């Protein structure tokens, strides 16, 4: 999906009934794993708050988050990021550590802390959910 107007539209909450979107998103990330480490549902044309990412802290397993919301962050830094929806890289502000509330694939509430590269990936994908393009 490269429609900037669609990508700039904040996504709606995910819920029961979005299981196929989750599967499609995981499959799309798997198919693009050589050039992509995370995706949000709006990148496949679905305006739902669903993200998936490769979690290196879990041996490269794909993690699914529904309705993610970053609740705390620290350690701001400037970086360059790319995106499948855009050409080239762009400068952006990220945080070295984040705390996040989300729901797992079974819609159970979760809270977690992430740091480093994984935290950066999550921030990028949550931005997609919020209609923010780097």
Region annotations inferred by a language model:
Residues 1-134:
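Positively charged
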